[in-house]
Design a protein with these regions (language model features):
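Donor/substrate-binding cores of folate-linked one-carbon enzymes
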Residues: 2-132, 136-137, 141
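Carbohydrate-active catalytic/glycan-binding domains of CAZyme proteins
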Residues: 131-427
């Protein structure tokens, strides 16, 4: 940790001295970078771009990114995501400065928050602190007993109808009444979306083969307390998931996640529900969780972009005047660099005149929980949302993850993950 800049140099440049701080300054001031998150078991590691003041790590925060802490004892390994994710911060803010002026940067700066760190200033850990931390960690490694039964994380769907919707349940949501849907032997189901067709309700979902670890898209009719036998509707030589299914005009479309292919592809239904033709490659990028919202003649695309698998994921917003038209990036992009809400968790929906975007929290681990965020402002120039309801896996015994939500009318469907013996779910 270098010495603090003081005096006239801080105001020598018109817009001050910009500096990275590799931790969340609401909890960590000082250093070493992204070490104390590991030490304290914090699931979130941060990075920020600030305008320096004479107070250590207390300047105006122009931009902040929050990433999942990488478990273990390697500080350098834990630095990879924050370093990589923040690599574009300066360029993004310089672009905004050029296009919109300094007042815009001040207006969009992270609001000041009270410091909540356990230490006033963090410094290089002492030998005794390292011993207190590493001793138990190394002891657990030495005493670790091999697991007799191999375990897998098994995803399933759960459905309910007639109960108050999750979005109406307030800060302590009630998820009682959900019925679990068992997957076929050797497979797991996740990422459910629902859509009506005539007087029938259907769900489309990710259907993964344990043996190949490759997903396809399957669908089933939603019936009282369950679903019909699933039918595969879209299968490729690469992994498919997150089937964002929707209607535009008189046509039914789907945008499945195909991140391993590196494209965002649009499919049109030519025979509902089981025949789909490729309509167009909408976007070429390593994208996940693409979710569409159509409103007032505009097509909005929420897309989580990542340069490398699992590194530096950011939520970007694009618009187009036609479904297959050219995408225009929103001037506020990226609209989130927070690992707790920058990945889609289901269809955007309107309820009681309010617009909601489900997002998943990947802080503790991928797909840990989901939040329903109310979209307060959505136009060509501004985007703003606020969290309303968060569902964590504690809603059902044994769950370690729940990351997708969909509802049509009073019917709701979610997914959930629990560790189970591999033999119990594989062929």
């Amino acid at each position: 940790m270098g010495s603090i800049l003081r005096g006239e140099i801080l105001t020598a440049a018109k817009y001050g001295v910009w500096s990275y701080h590799h931790s969340d300054n609401q909890y960590y001031r000082g250093g070493p970078a992204n070490f104390w998150e590991l030490y304290e078991g914090n699931p979130i590691s941060g990075v920020m771009l600030q305008v320096l003041t004479e107070e250590l790590d207390a300047g105006k925060v122009l931009y902040k990114g929050l990433f999942a802490t990488r478990p273990g004892i390697s500080r350098m390994r834990n630095c990879v995501q924050p370093y990589w994710g923040a690599s574009t911060f300066v360029i993004q803010k310089l672009r905004e400065l050029h296009q919109h002026g300094w007042e815009h940067l001040e207006r969009t700066a992270v609001p000041p928050a009270a410091y909540l760190g356990k230490k006033k200033i963090y410094t290089v850990p002492s030998n005794s602190e390292m011993l207190r931390w590493l001793g138990p960690v190394l002891l657990r490694k030495v005493l670790r007993v091999p697991v007799c039964r191999p375990m897998v994380e098994h995803w399933r769907l759960a459905i309910r109808s007639g109960a108050p919707l999750v979005v109406d349940s307030g800060p302590t949501p009630d998820l009682s009444g959900f019925h679990w849907i068992e997957s076929m032997k050797g497979r797991f189901y996740a990422d459910p979306f629902m859509i009506e067709d005539g007087d029938k309700l259907w769900t489309f979902f990710e259907d993964v083969d344990y043996e190949t670890q490759r997903g396809r898209i399957s669908c089933a009719e939603v019936q009282k307390g369950g679903i019909s036998n699933p039918v595969p509707v879209l299968e490729m030589p690469y992994h498919l998931s997150y089937p964002c299914v929707f209607r535009a005009g008189n046509e039914t479309y789907m945008i499945p996640e195909s991140g391993s292919k590196g494209t965002v592809d649009l499919y049109r239904c030519v025979r509902f529900p089981d025949k789909w033709d490729m309509e167009k490659e909408l976007f070429r990028a390593p994208a996940v969780g693409t979710t569409i919202w159509i409103d007032d003649g505009l097509y909005w695309f929420f897309v989580s972009l990542e340069e490398l698998r699992g590194l530096g994921t950011q939520l970007w917003l694009f618009s187009a005047t036609t479904l297959t038209g050219e995408w225009t990036p929103h001037p506020g992009n990226p609209i989130s660099t927070d690992v707790r809400n920058n990945r889609g968790a289901g269809a955007v929906f309107r309820h009681d005149g309010k617009l909601f975007r489900p997002s998943q929290d990947c802080g503790k681990h991928e797909g840990y929980s989901f939040t329903l965020n109310q979209i307060v402002t959505l136009d060509r120039y501004q985007y703003q949302e606020k969290p309303c309801v968060t569902i964590n896996p504690l809603w059902a015994p044994g769950l370690v993850g729940t990351h997708t939500y969909s509802h049509v009318g009073q019917v709701e469907i979610v997914d959930g993950c629990e560790p189970v013996p591999a033999r119990s779910v594989r062929d």
